[in-house]
Amino acid sequence: MIRAKKHFGQNFLQDEAVLNKIIQAIPKDTQNIVEIGPGLGDLTFKILQICSVTAYEIDSELFALLGKKFAKEVQNGRLKLFCKDALEKWDEGGVSEQGYFLVANLPYYVATKMILSAIDDEKCRGLVVMIQREVALKFSAKSGESEFSSLAILANLQGSCELLFDVSAQCFNPPPKVVSSVIKIQKSKILLGESGIFKDKFEYEKFKIFLKIAFASPRKTLMKNLSAKFDKFELNTLFAELNLSPAIRPHELNVELYLKIFENLKEDNERQKRRKSGSLAGQEQ
């Protein structure tokens, strides 16, 4: 009998009703799924009924068990099974060579990092994952809610994020000490490129830095947070143009407004650079 290992954050989901609800949340046109931490293979078994699976299991003991349990699927290519850390695969270039949908019961200690990696991965079409409820609320929060943060903006940037349902600790073996929730992110927009939200990865990374500044102190006003890095006069002008109160707080804006503020500050910065380079050229003459 295989026991859950604490250092891998293992809690095996074995409730039939919950497993079925996760399957029902997967888009009907999905052809390729990536599963992280398949564990004993209960969810894997159900996913294989609808499409092919690429699974990453870091535990060598479970990897061997899964290889035996799904020997037929591995042999015919319906299941690609790797004994590897999925985060390392993302760092190396990606968890799949083709477009995919992520479905997983994620280990709590790396859930946020894995979701952000999937959000950044242009091959990922979306995800249905189970995580700690506290983290789920941060990703699925709506503008105006106190939990609304940079995580919610990134989760909704390319589409939508919603909390589907909560899962009792009794649905797992062993039962975790927290309540879990299943969230769904469905991407509908292109992230990078000419028709994308950002022209390239460099600009996207700058946007993420901008969000860190904006939410540096959530209880302070957005103006106060941004003025630590940007010109106060330009911020006042921009807020007036967008009809934003100087007293507005970071969680009270929506994704579109954050994109507008970022775009305007980027254009102001580029204008300043052009003016500086022009004045330097004049001095040299």
UniProtKB/Swiss-Prot annotation:
Cellular localisation: Cytoplasm
Superkingdom of origin organism: Bacteria
Primary location class: cytoplasm
EC number: 2.1.1.182
Record flagged with keyword Phosphoprotein: no
Catalytic reaction list: adenosine(1518)/adenosine(1519) in 16S rRNA + 4 S-adenosyl-L-methionine = N(6)-dimethyladenosine(1518)/N(6)-dimethyladenosine(1519) in 16S rRNA + 4 S-adenosyl-L-homocysteine + 4 H(+)
S-S pairs: none
GO (cellular component) term, any one: cytosol
One Pfam family in the UniProt entry: RrnaAD
Alphabetic keyword roster: Cytoplasm, Methyltransferase, RNA-binding, rRNA processing, S-adenosyl-L-methionine, Transferase
PROSITE patterns: RRNA_A_DIMETH, SAM_RNA_A_N6_MT
Enzyme class, UniProt record, top EC level: transferase
Annotated binding of S-adenosyl-L-methionine, by residue: 11, 13, 37, 57, 85, 105
Assigned protein family: Belongs to the class I-like SAM-binding methyltransferase superfamily. rRNA adenine N(6)-methyltransferase family. RsmA subfamily.
PANTHER family, A to Z: DIMETHYLADENOSINE TRANSFERASE (PTHR11727), DIMETHYLADENOSINE TRANSFERASE-RELATED (PTHR11727:SF7)
Role this protein plays: Specifically dimethylates two adjacent adenosines (A1518 and A1519) in the loop of a conserved hairpin near the 3'-end of 16S rRNA in the 30S particle. May play a critical role in biogenesis of 30S subunits.
Record's protein name: Ribosomal RNA small subunit methyltransferase A
